[in-house]
Amino acid sequence: MGNGVQPLDPVAIQIGSISVKWYGVIIASAVVIALLLALSEANKRKMDKEIIVDLLIWAIPISIISARIYYVIFEWDFYKNNLGEIVKIWHGGIAIYGALIGAVLTAVIFSRIKKISFWKLADVVAPSLIIAQAIGRWGNFMNQEAHGAETTRAFLEGLHLPEFIINQMYIDGAYYQPTFLYESLWNVLGFIVLLIIRRTKIRSGELFLSYVIWYSFGRFFIEGMRTDSLMWGDFRVSQVLSLLLIVLSIGLIIYRRVKMNPPYYMEDKLGKVAKKK
């Protein structure tokens, strides 16, 4: 690479012709950490830990598939002429919002089958989801993707970033905004916020909805900085969806408080569908 800057090797392990990329290692690590956190939270909420494990067994593959389908739909102009590329997710091209949609649908169906409260289940996994997203963005970093517009080395140095991040943002002869880092840090902060508000007098389901609001708010602004956004006409898909999710989540919080009177978060411990008070 020009300018004497070398990117980090995206391959973590090479055994003969088989290579394991850092992207996969980081995503797998994010899943494991999310599982451990969810199990810990389930224990505090008096929920059977096997429920969390069973949910993830279904949610992980479905989320990966839905994330890929979401991406392919909005990049169909490319994939319609390259059908073989659709299954090659190691080439990149999965969308977090697609994964979130798949995970929520899986949890809704799963909670009905297991006869437990969807909202309680969603609250338990909310902190895990946002920290997993924070970790997962470093997979994008290793692949030199999900970056922002072109910038200068001086600007990156002005952010007091470590040298390895600055060098990794040097792509095809230019430096780029590390939007992956902005989102990762936003999610870490969101994780801390969720841990704080779960100790307040929020209602069942509101921890998850707070996660959706927090993530969507940050994603709306960060998405505007990216150069690889999925587009719907003249609109960035993730920005449109972010606004819709913020409005929907706030609306659900208000509606459920007024019409359903859900139990307080820390009182909903039985793992069964919460009844109205």
From Swiss-Prot:
Compartment(s) where it occurs, according to its Swiss-Prot or TrEMBL record: Cell membrane
Pathway connected to this protein: Protein modification; lipoprotein biosynthesis (diacylglyceryl transfer)
Record EC number: 2.5.1.145
PROSITE patterns: LGT
UniProt topology in membrane: Multi-pass membrane protein
Keywords: Cell membrane, Membrane, Transferase, Transmembrane, Transmembrane helix
Residues spanning the membrane: 18-38, 51-71, 89-109, 116-136, 177-197, 205-225, 235-255
Stretch forming the signal peptide: none
GO molecular function annotations of the record: phosphatidylglycerol-prolipoprotein diacylglyceryl transferase activity
Pfam families: LGT (PF01790)
EC category: transferase
UniProt key word Membrane: yes
Major localisation: membrane
GO biological process: lipoprotein biosynthetic process
InterPro entries xrefs: Lgt
Binding residue positions for a 1,2-diacyl-sn-glycero-3-phospho-(1'-sn-glycerol): 137
GO cellular component, one term: plasma membrane
Superkingdom of the source species: Bacteria
Purpose of the protein: Catalyzes the transfer of the diacylglyceryl group from phosphatidylglycerol to the sulfhydryl group of the N-terminal cysteine of a prolipoprotein, the first step in the formation of mature lipoproteins.
Family: Belongs to the Lgt family.
Name of the protein: Phosphatidylglycerol--prolipoprotein diacylglyceryl transferase
